[in-house]
């Protein structure tokens, strides 16, 4: 079956407005939504978009719309009004059969952690979803709102943190390990970025498929 994929971007550094992160960078996420490069399993990312950012109180905020990014009439005003030192962004190409809805639109954020995922987990409908749920506490299960593989991966990450993972990298590694075990080693693309507003942690991983590209750029402060 055809499985579509999202595009993601992340930023950590001096405070910048949302416009700089989402719209103004060369080949920005906005441009990638309709003019992608190196996109292997979709043509457009028009099924929603979202951003997450570190708020003044240290918690991660999120904004998501289940529409193409270029159709959001609120974006120009938000792009100038919101500023942060940490951003995550995602433009979505929904897997066929997955509802296009705000609750299924990344990034996902709970309290002081946010996550965005480019890729997919196969096998959820073949028992993988139930096996993932069996690894989640009642508290984490109660916070599930949508139906996507990405949100279930985020739930596993939060569970790993509740179970005592000492840092984000350890929690992400645990989430990826359990997710691939629960889906019995079926095909998966697992480019993931996690943020607590003070650090970014990435994975570039795949099962039975080539990894999607993932680029890192470091610039001097300021």
Each language-model region and where it sits:
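Short helix/loop capping segments that flank catalytic or ligand/cofactor-binding pockets
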Residues: 19-20, 61-62, 97-99, 124-126, ...
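Short, basic and Ser/Thr-rich N-terminal targeting/leader segments
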Residues: 2-4, 45-49, 82-84, 89, ...
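A short, polar/proline- and glycine-enriched secondary-structure boundary/capping micro-motif
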Residues: 72-75, 134, 211-218
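Short acidic (Asp/Glu) patches
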Residues: 33-36, 66-78, 89-111, 135-138
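Structured interaction and signal-relay segments at domain junctions
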Residues: 48-85, 89-91, 204-208
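Conserved catalytic micro-motifs used in adenylation/nucleotidyl-transfer and phosphoryl/amide-
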Residues: 6, 51, 105-121, 177-222
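Extreme N-terminus nucleophile/cap motif
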Residues: 2-67
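Short histidine
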Residues: 122-196
């Amino acid at each position: 079956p055809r499985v579509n994929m999202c595009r993601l971007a992340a930023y950590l550094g001096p405070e910048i407005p949302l416009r700089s992160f989402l719209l103004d960078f060369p080949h920005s996420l906005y441009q990638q939504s309709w003019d992608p490069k190196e996109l292997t399993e979709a043509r457009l990312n028009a099924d929603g978009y979202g951003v997450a950012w570190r708020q003044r109180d240290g918690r991660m905020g999120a904004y998501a719309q289940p529409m193409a990014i270029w159709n959001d009439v609120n974006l120009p005003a938000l792009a100038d009004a919101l500023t942060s030192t940490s951003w995550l962004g995602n433009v979505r190409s929904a897997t066929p059969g997955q509802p296009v809805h705000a609750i299924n639109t990344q990034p996902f954020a709970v309290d002081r952690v946010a996550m965005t995922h480019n890729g997919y987990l196969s096998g959820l409908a073949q028992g993988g979803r139930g096996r993932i749920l069996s690894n989640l506490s009642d508290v984490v299960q109660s916070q599930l709102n949508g139906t996507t593989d990405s949100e279930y991966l985020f739930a596993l990450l939060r569970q790993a943190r509740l179970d005592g993972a000492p840092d984000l990298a350890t929690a992400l590694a645990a989430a990826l390990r359990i997710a691939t075990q629960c889906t019995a080693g079926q095909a998966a693309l697992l480019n993931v970025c996690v943020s607590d507003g003070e650090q970014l942690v990435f994975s570039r991983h795949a099962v039975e498929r080539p990894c999607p590209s993932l680029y890192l750029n470091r610039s001097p402060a300021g």
